[in-house]
Amino acid sequence: MSFLRCVVLLLVLMSNLHAADSRLPVTGGERQWPQASGPQGTWAVGADSVPLKWSVARGEGVLWRTTLPETGQGGIAVWGNRVFLTTLKPEAGQLPLGKDVIGHCLDAKTGKILWTVTLPGRETSVPAYFFSDATSPSPVADGQHVWFFNACGSVGCYDFAGKQIWMREWQPTGGRPFNKQFEPILFNDTLLNMEPRDADDPKREGKDPWNYLRALDKRTGRTLWVADDAMTHYNTPVFGRLPDGTPAVLQGRGAYHGVPELPIGLSLTSLAAGKEGKTIWRYETNRSKACYTMHWNAKYAAWFDIDASEHQVLDVATGKLLRTQSLVKQVDWRRFNPAKGKHELLTGVDLTKQTPPLKVFPAQFCNILLGDWHYFLCYTEASKHLGPPYCVGRVHLETGQVEYLEVPVSIVREAGQPDQFIWNRPQTSSTVNSRGIEVATDKRSRGDGWWWGYLGSPTAIGGKVFFTTMLGITYVIDGRAAVLDERALLAVNDLGHPGRTWSLNSLSFAEGRVYHRSMKEAVCLGPK
């Protein structure tokens, strides 16, 4: 091969690499975790090697642990040698007020807290509320700056030394339980937040204003545009691209407590230059709630109908409903038989004909698309006949095949003792913070997370799906398994001893390490 041809080939390869990188929502973020949804903005990332097993209770696979001064339930941003997360502002000798948020910058190698900043709030959230609180939105980073959020009404931009660049405050919608599940999205120089229209905006609704995607200039905090269609504050929108490369965000409407935004359903909102905030398509329905992470891929978007225990698949190009799939009929259910100490298969069963009849209510915000499968946890509540109990579920987007695998609720790990799995029994978690103060005022926050709470969104790394419950238990599922059986359960990990741990967090992954957190501490996990 001639020298000239070598040069041409190298230029082509570099051009292709640049084109691939330019498709990332955050430039240069392919090896980082710049936002809650990861470098692709989809909560999924490829990886050749990922830590699968750890135990904070035993100190196994733990590179560092850092005590946090107060509770928090947002995700973790990682860029280079910096880790960013938030907690509520601690109050001396008492539980936090749930209004102000502290942004923390940690050293990624040691876990040392390097600096902190305070973000003020205009509303008040319930501390350690098992739906959400002021810390629910995760930080965002781009290698030069980090943006911390307070769901009670502020966002601040800082450089990596902690110097404030700008601060924006706004008035969140109120009058209902807090339940704000929005996760910020960074796309190029545009930072997406969820806010109502400004008070002087002629399009703003009256006494009960709607929420919208609001685009901010990441450099100044100035509003660039507000999306055409509204969204509920319960919803977690997701970034993606259409087959032609058009960048867009899938957002939803419809939730509890009479949220006003209409119509119930989905909107795909464009981020393309010159069409920012415009609606590509809208799917309207009078059923169910948009209380999920709104995953979609190059072919399909998905919607759970919790009233009918059904899964709906939409054409991502048009928003047209393609098919409705039952989550209760002709399903394969692998449940654990404690007498035999192993799983048993019930194949092709109708859950509505069990004793008692079962309904399937996919756990809200605990869902993720991986390939052609939509994975989720199943809410479990005997009095409401919800199940299958303590199961990971998945439904195939094309065939409608549905599988359920029961997993242990918890695990007891003591030094020198074998692991003890706890099956099919409700458990309790602890909402005592690192300073020994009980911070939860709602007793429901002390459950196991398998019923009526908003767990952290699952993350897929290298084809493995990581689910974390309120107990701090993290299940690792082989997302490429041909069959969802006990072999697909790769690990049951912990963030601390059972009954003494609490987490509503998603994990992050960068440079071969997993970053996670509980109420009491942040941890870095991986091989030493």
List each language-model region with its residue ranges.
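N-terminal secretory signal peptides that target proteins for export/translocation
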Residues: 1-3
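Bacterial N-terminal signal peptides
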Residues: 5-16
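Noncatalytic, solvent-exposed loop/strand surfaces
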Residues: 20-528
